Amino acid sequence: MLYTNNYNIPKIIIALDFYNKKEAMTLVDLLDPSVFYLKIGKEMFTILGFKFVKELHKLGFNVFLDLKFHDIPNTVFNATKAAADLGIWMLSVHASGGKNMLLSAKKALKSFKKPPLLIAVTMLTSLKEKDLKEIGIKISLKDYILILSKLSNDCGLDGIVCPGNQAKKIKSLYGDKYKIITPGIRLSSDSSFDQKHIITPKEAKEFQIDYIVIGRSITTSKNPIKKLNLIIESMR
């Protein structure tokens, strides 16, 4: 691979967007756990459960468990604690769950010596402003993200998932310790799939994003390592 973590570029999280373990492991076996992070979302976690997380840990990978908890505070407290018990590196909750829910998630991690990074999802990248209006949110998408970013920071979370074009503004408000994770990363030649907020890897570097999440651009590629090298080279 061309890439090492010594490069001053966003770190790469590979989203394991598969429907079966065999396909997932075919890709995982090509990756260096000292360089790449892995994301398990609702699909793979529902299919394979916590045992798959532990298997990836045994291979040396840091795992981002992207389950986007969004429920009453007590439920999120217990779910967060259960997730942290797996020894994961990062965990997501929905910022729109509100202050009490976010505080409950943070509280659930207090007993852990090395808790996972707790990250708030501000908005799904499949949504546009008209989608917000349809559910009664009348402010702009940009302002909505800024409000939820502030709420998440105030509640002591470690960072947010947000569209890349908001990253610089959020970094200027909350500093480098507040991590920015951005999905929807595509080379200009890639399909957008169902993502509405797309940026290129080069833009991700310019926007000071900490972690980029790359899924179907890699998982649907006939040569995922070649594609990863192209992405990495475009950020150097």
From Swiss-Prot:
Pathway: Pyrimidine metabolism; UMP biosynthesis via de novo pathway; UMP from orotate: step 2/2. InterPro entries: Aldolase_TIM (IPR013785), OMPdecase (IPR014732), OMPdecase_AS (IPR018089), OMPdecase_bac (IPR047596), OMPdeCOase_dom (IPR001754), RibuloseP-bd_barrel (IPR011060). One of its GO terms (molecular function) is orotidine-5'-phosphate decarboxylase activity. Its EC number is 4.1.1.23. The active site is at residue 68. Substrate binds at residues 17, 39, 66-75, 125, 186, 195, 215-216. One of its GO terms (cellular component) is cytosol. PROSITE patterns: OMPDECASE (PS00156). GO terms for biological process: 'de novo' pyrimidine nucleobase biosynthetic process; 'de novo' UMP biosynthetic process. It catalyses: orotidine 5'-phosphate + H(+) = UMP + CO2. PANTHER family: OROTIDINE 5'-PHOSPHATE DECARBOXYLASE (PTHR32119:SF2). Belongs to the OMP decarboxylase family. Type 1 subfamily. HAMAP family: OMPdecase_type1_B (MF_01200_B). Catalyzes the decarboxylation of orotidine 5'-monophosphate (OMP) to uridine 5'-monophosphate (UMP). This is Orotidine 5'-phosphate decarboxylase. It comes from Buchnera aphidicola subsp. Schizaphis graminum (strain Sg). The gene is pyrF.
